[in-house]
UniProtKB/Swiss-Prot annotation:
Homodimer. It catalyses: a long-chain 2,3-saturated fatty acyl-CoA + oxidized [electron-transfer flavoprotein] + H(+) = a long-chain (2E)-enoyl-CoA + reduced [electron-transfer flavoprotein]; a medium-chain 2,3-saturated fatty acyl-CoA + oxidized [electron-transfer flavoprotein] + H(+) = a medium-chain (2E)-enoyl-CoA + reduced [electron-transfer flavoprotein]; a short-chain 2,3-saturated fatty acyl-CoA + oxidized [electron-transfer flavoprotein] + H(+) = a short-chain (2E)-enoyl-CoA + reduced [electron-transfer flavoprotein]; octadecanoyl-CoA + oxidized [electron-transfer flavoprotein] + H(+) = (2E)-octadecenoyl-CoA + reduced [electron-transfer flavoprotein]. PANTHER family: ACYL-COA DEHYDROGENASE (PTHR42803), BROAD-SPECIFICITY LINEAR ACYL-COA DEHYDROGENASE FADE5 (PTHR42803:SF1). The keyword Lipid metabolism applies. It comes from Mycolicibacterium smegmatis (strain ATCC 700084 / mc(2)155) (Mycobacterium smegmatis). This is Broad-specificity linear acyl-CoA dehydrogenase FadE5. Its cofactor is FAD. GO terms for cellular component: plasma membrane. Its EC number is 1.3.8.8, 1.3.8.7, 1.3.8.1. Keywords: FAD, Fatty acid metabolism, Flavoprotein, Lipid metabolism, Oxidoreductase. It comes from the Bacteria.
Amino acid sequence: MSHYKSNVRDQVFNLFEVFGVDKVLGADKFSDLDADTAREMLTEIARLAEGPIAESFVEGDRNPPVFDPETHTVTLPEGFKKSMRALFDGGWDKVGLAEHLGGIPMPRALQWALIEHILGANPAAYMYAMGPGMSEIFYNNGTDEQKKWATIAAERGWGATMVLTEPDAGSDVGAGRTKAVQQPDGTWHIEGVKRFITSADSDDLFENIMHLVLARPEGAGPGTKGLSLFFVPKFHFDHETGEIGERNGVFVTNVEHKMGLKVSATCELSLGQHGIPAVGWLVGEVHNGIAQMFDVIEQARMMVGTKAIATLSTGYLNALEYAKERVQGADMTQMTDKTAPRVTITHHPDVRRSLMTQKAYAEGLRAIYLYTATFQDAEVAQAVHGVDGDLAARVNDLLLPIVKGFGSETAYAKLTESLQTLGGSGFLQDYPIEQYIRDSKIDSLYEGTTAIQAQDFFFRKIIRDKGQALAYVAGEIEQFIKNENGNGRLKTERELLATALADVQGMAASLTGYLMAAQEDAASIYKVGLGSVRFLMAVGDLLSGWLLARQAAVAIEKLDAGATGADKSFYEGKIAAASFFAKNMLPLLTSTRQIIENLDNDVMELDEAAF
């Protein structure tokens, strides 16, 4: 039996019943795709994920990649490569890719819904399969000549990496020292060592790998502004035919031993260090590396958040299945009666609390990433939200740190509830949840730690944006609060949501006040740092509560229209999750607001020796 448990029903509900993404299908850019086809695609990829892709999940963990320092190569477990080939054979690595690169255009919301299944079943499989998506980013940023190379890479299914991190330049990317030296023929020789590079070698999955490398040209200034982006292929190739040539001077020199996500080869990558120059080409022939790389980074952050959410969802569904079957103890109302019948643990109050917590967060987080994705296509944003492309881009930028930061922190935390549901059995490798937890911890670390996400959220996505995107989302929440959808049956939930919105707005005002005060007292900026992660998490809870309540309003309409059977149970679950979240999670934001409003610098003024 597969460890992975999909939830296509919830995806379809979000896409078509709540957000109305079907409005854009069958016309213009998406003329070849209708709602029925979209449903079939979701069902088909869920079947593939539960079968061939999930099959090697455990094998890849127990038998991680083997590095050969003599050949600088990585050997992957055979079962995992079989899973990858099943993914490639179905063309699933090209979902959402531009038509001129061999893909099928589709709304980003549908694309991410499809990807959720791969990430939930075997997350490393999607990471190895990111080549076509990276090819499109290279195509969009490249010169006319480089667009040809990107097309070759997509057509031939090459692998790809994003190469930023160095031993002394992690979150501080601008401290990178990898050097680029221009050659007389216009190419560049890249010299340096990079660290924590995902999929820098991948056995025989790909005939070539294109590395997108941040490096500092000789004479360039310090910090991120001095960095440029270079295309550095593993093998040289014929620029017209794509035929593979000689080895380029970029070699894997180590593979990390990790807590989880083991089958994903996390590599040290040395450039120009082994007697062969690492030849690269300046992407777009412009020195604009960090801005170009942010196209890749934003894609990666969306992926990480979706991965975390997918893992929590399957963790919850595994816990639910176990709880429905595990018989232990009597019902609490009969706990003093030693002759009372034994019941399944779903009868116990704390198990129900835990399961509903998992359900509410798993489904709330799914709603957040899909809501975010509806702003990633101008056509969808216009049809679904009535906003123009500029505002859509701003809202997407605002929400990405929520998807990544809030999603990764929350999924990891609530997966412990999934494990707890299984009791001691959850601690065993007989069940998948302990691996889910190990595999998901990385999500709050790579592609920008949660603190980085929180500061990006506050400084760039709110302050620099002058609050435009935040005001739009707050306005949407206010409109829902005032709406009477549900015939008054969500009155309490709306009142709790209104309080939560006011609490979040109060937090934003306090943090802005600390920022303004820093103009006179520089140390005041510390308070922003002390409060920003809590603020990010609070906004995530607010969005979860709102989107769950929106779902409940739709569910009430469906029940009033006579839904029966499995649909009736599904909609009743939606109302229950929204009500539970509003009553149990949203009130906690009031205390968070009080904490942020009363922040001081005591912890910053404490001597380091006292820690």
